[in-house]
């Protein structure tokens, strides 16, 4: 069977949604691997008025843009509202989600099934993180840093620097 070449008409665009507060090496692992699977990957930062993020939307976007620069087929965007509506607006065919543990799976399965109910043509692709990041979350990174622990190797150097600036009161140059 001859190889099928993907044309722009059949572009496989995926959305990788999240709060990315802060961006971790686990997120970057999924971005790198997702960039190899999809023709285009849109890393989409959720604007959630109900959450009080550590980093502003602009700060998170800038950090993500700086970190995904090496990937030609990855771009950063923001959204609010229903993910399925946003995905359809962007003409995405898939949502990329990371699953670290059974607890993630239960939640993500529920979300994927609801998304399928709302938008049957939108697929959810679950990806396991590299083993080194299977326990890593933004919440843990913030807690470790707040308590004086090292986050080296858990987040990119840029993010570690921004955490220092946030927690120690020096102005960020974003």
Identify the meaning behind each predicted range.
Residues 1-174:
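Nucleotidyltransferase catalytic core that binds NTPs
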């Amino acid at each position: 069977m001859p190889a099928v070449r993907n044309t722009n008409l059949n572009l496989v665009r995926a959305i990788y949604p999240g709060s990315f507060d802060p961006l971790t090496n686990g997120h970057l692992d999924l971005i790198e691997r997702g960039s190899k699977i999809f023709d285009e990957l849109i890393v989409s930062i959720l604007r959630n008025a109900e959450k009080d993020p550590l980093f502003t939307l602009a700060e998170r976007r800038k950090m993500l843009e700086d970190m995904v620069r090496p990937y030609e087929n990855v771009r950063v965007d923001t959204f609010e509202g229903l993910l399925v509506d946003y995905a359809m607006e962007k003409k995405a065919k898939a949502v990329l989600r990371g699953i670290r543990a059974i607890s993630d799976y239960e939640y993500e399965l529920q979300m994927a099934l609801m998304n399928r109910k709302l938008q049957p043509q939108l697929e959810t692709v679950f990806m396991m993180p590299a083993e080194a990041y299977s326990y890593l979350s933004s919440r843990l990174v913030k807690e470790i840093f707040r308590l004086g622990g090292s986050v080296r190797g858990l987040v990119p150097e840029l993010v570690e620097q921004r955490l220092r600036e946030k927690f120690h009161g020096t102005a960020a140059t974003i």
